[in-house]
Amino acid sequence: VHWTAEEKQLITGLWGKVNVADCGAEALARLLIVYPWTQRFFASFGNLSSPTAILGNPMVRAHGKKVLTSFGDAVKNLDNIKNTFAQLSELHCDKLHVDPENFRLLGDILIIVLAAHFPKEFTPECQAAWQKLVRVVAHALARKYH
């Protein structure tokens, strides 16, 4: 994947403002609410029976932070995303059996969360760079499936 200097700047510039705990929790909660079938991968998280329960669930919050923290590894390693996510791809494919389509869904949700949190900064150019990034990350996570 080739990144232009502008794309790198748009991604890293916005990432520097992201509250990983809050945005991660919101992104995962939205995924579980908007696409309820994804809840089956989180059966150990306890009560996911309603949007209120999901939004207040500390395990959702903690895992959302973990997910977005690892997404930060992509931001730090834009030129080596495939290798950055090799182990996570293996885990999600071989052990957790997550449908790789869910990575794309979470990426789309992350775009919505970023747009909501940063309405001024999230210009169409910024969105284009981030869409490219979430697509590359989703592809890297799905790599073990191919």
Swiss-Prot record:
A biological-process GO annotation: hydrogen peroxide catabolic process
GO CC annotations? blood microparticle; haptoglobin-hemoglobin complex; hemoglobin complex
Task: Kindly give the PROSITE patterns that the UniProt entry links to this protein.
Answer: GLOBIN
Tissue specificity statement from the Swiss-Prot or TrEMBL entry: Red blood cells.
Name the keywords, alphabetized: Heme, Iron, Metal-binding, Oxygen transport, Transport
Superkingdom of this protein's organism: Eukaryota
Q: Which GO terms describe its molecular function?
A: haptoglobin binding; heme binding; metal ion binding; organic acid binding; oxygen binding; oxygen carrier activity; peroxidase activity
* Presence of keyword Membrane: no
For the ligand (heme b), the binding residues are H63, H92
Q: Where is the Globin domain?
A: 2-146
| Annotated InterPro entries | Globin, Globin-like_sf, Globin/Proto, Hemoglobin_b, Hemoglobin_oxygen_transport
Outline the subunit composition: Heterotetramer of two alpha chains and two beta chains.
Per its database record, what is this protein's job? Involved in oxygen transport from the lung to the various peripheral tissues.
Assigned protein family:
Belongs to the globin family.
Q: What is this protein called?
A: Hemoglobin subunit beta
- Give the gene symbol: HBB
